[in-house]
Amino acid sequence: MATRIRPAERRTTVGQHAGMERSIAISQPTVGSVGLYSAVVSTAPGDRTRIHHHGDCETSIYIVAGQARYTWGPTGIEHEMTAAAGDFVYIPAGEIHVEENASASEPLVVVLSRDCPDSHVVYLDGGPDGADDIPAPC
């Protein structure tokens, strides 16, 4: 059955860090999805994720507003690119990477879709809380 998810029906959670908010529309918990996750993600100016990957899940990101910086490679920082409003970014399954809001003053807003039923995040850097390999809430 087709399902419409209105903004008020999305599940809002903190993302990978306090400066990231996920407004989850499609996931296993929201609509019973078995193979698709889709959310609007807002990141505060200057914020960035920890070094991570998404396991076997491919990721599509559409930049709605702002400018993003992505780094990737064996340690998550060897290569770099920026993406602006209107750009799509593809992140292959297993790609170790970091996402950052490249602006010091404007929020970054993206639509993120992944071919798995939840956010599926695997951290590699230990982070400030020492919580390696703990998936983010979906």
List each model region and its residues.
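Conserved hydrophobic/aromatic beta-strand scaffold that supports enzyme active sites
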Residues: R22, S38-S42, S60, E80, ...
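A short beta-strand-loop-beta hairpin characteristic of the jelly-roll/cupin
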Residues: R48, C57-A85, E95, E100
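Short strand-connecting beta-turns/loops that link adjacent beta-strands
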Residues: V31, D56, T75, A104-S105
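A short, N-terminal "cap"/entry segment at the start of jelly-roll beta-barrel domains
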Residues: M1-L36, V40, R50, V121-C138
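Short, charged/polar surface micro-motifs in flexible loops or helix N-caps
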Residues: V31-V34, T43-D47, A65-R69, E95, ...
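Ligand-binding loop in jelly-roll beta-barrel domains
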Residues: A84-A85, A93-H120
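Residue-level signal for beta-strand positions within conserved beta-sheet cores that form or flank
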Residues: V34, H79, E106-P107
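Residue-level recognition of conserved beta-strand positions in structured domain cores
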Residues: V40, H53, W72-P74, N101, ...
